Regions:
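Cap/insert and terminal regions of metallo-dependent hydrolase folds
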Residues: 153-252
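Active-site metal-binding motif and surrounding structural segment of the metallo-beta-lactamase
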Residues: 34-80
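Active-site environment of divalent metal-dependent phosphoester hydrolases
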Residues: 12, 60-63, 85-86, 128, ...
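Conserved beta-strand hairpin/beta-sheet module of binuclear metal-dependent hydrolase folds
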Residues: 1-43, 131-147, 164
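Metal-dependent catalytic neighborhoods of phosphoester/phosphodiester hydrolases
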Residues: 64-73, 88-91, 226-233
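Structured catalytic core of nucleotide-sugar glycosyltransferases
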Residues: 5-15, 58-62, 66, 77, ...
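Metallo-beta-lactamase
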Residues: 81-132, 136-139
Length: 268
């Protein structure tokens, strides 16, 4: 049995909590420690009980608090070598990671944390490096895919393996292209190493999800170029084109950008 909690999912800050009865981890650390403490405490949880932190990539909204978390709570932080170097270069990380708390992982490597198996996989994004994570117990497969420019074969395979998926649904293309962003930023977002749109994200799920998929959460929605109702509506429209119905074939939810979710218990 897995437990899942989103502690922030936007360009302002990203952090996700996953736990079994025996171990608790965070994926990404872009939310201030004070907010993490408050939101965990409200749900009967505590930072002191976290066992490890896994980082997807070195953009500030995913790493701002990682140094404070590691040093204040004596937490091992798992990253690829390139992401680790990027963290220590990033001026937004005021407390750098020291060797004591650094755990370097390779892509496709599986790390066992208690009864949880965490496997990284490569995803395309314009950071120093970027990975998604597959978190497994003996019963569940949970996949987190955020900040991706396009769907690679690796990502497609991870979607097919999952019972539960957190996946980026960053922007509506029309809102982005008609919006106030400068041309270079629009180009960056739409590139193969930028961010995935609502429609492309939905198509990825529709084409590659297995019948074992139970639940999907949309994450990392742009505040300027998207909104939750539009992301959901786009997903529902694309799914129907493939003969799938949200709420029937699997549950579909949208994670809040700057507010923590409820603590969810996941069962297959």
């Amino acid at each position: 049995m897995l437990k899942f909690l989103s502690l922030g999912s936007s360009s302002s800050g990203n952090c996700y909590y996953l736990a079994t009865d025996n171990v608790q981890i965070l994926v990404d650390a872009g939310v201030p420690v004070r907010s993490l403490k408050h939101d965990l405490k409200e749900r009967g949880l505590a930072l002191n009980d976290i066992d490890a932190v896994f980082i997807t990539h070195d953009h500030a909204d995913h790493i701002k608090a990682v140094g404070h978390l590691a040093h204040d709570y004596h937490l091992p932080v798992y990253t690829t070598e390139e992401v680790h170097r990027g963290i220590n270069r990033n001026y937004c990380v005021t407390t750098k990671l020291t060797p004591e708390y650094t755990r370097i992982i390779q892509k496709s490597q599986t790390v066992e944390v208690g009864d949880m198996r965490v496997t990284s996989f490569s995803v395309p994004h314009d950071s120093s490096d970027c990975v998604g994570y597959r978190i497994e117990t003996d019963e569940e497969v949970f996949v987190l895919i955020t900040d991706i420019g396009h769907a690679t074969e690796t990502i497609q395979n991870e979607v097919s393996a999952a019972n539960f998926i957190v996946i980026e649904s960053n922007h509506d293309v029309d809102m982005l292209m008609m919006g106030p962003y400068p041309a270079y930023l629009k180009g960056r977002i739409r590139s193969g190493r930028g961010h995935i749109s609502n429609a492309d994200s939905a198509k990825l799920i529709a084409e590659h999800a297995s019948p074992a998929l139970k639940r999907v959460w949309l994450c990392h929605l742009s505040e300027e170029n998207n909104h939750p109702e539009l992301a959901r509506k786009t997903y529902e429209t694309v799914l129907r084109e493939y003969g799938l119905i949200a709420g029937v074939d699997f549950q579909l939810d949208v994670l809040r950008r700057k507010q923590a979710s409820e603590l969810m218990v996941l069962k297959t």
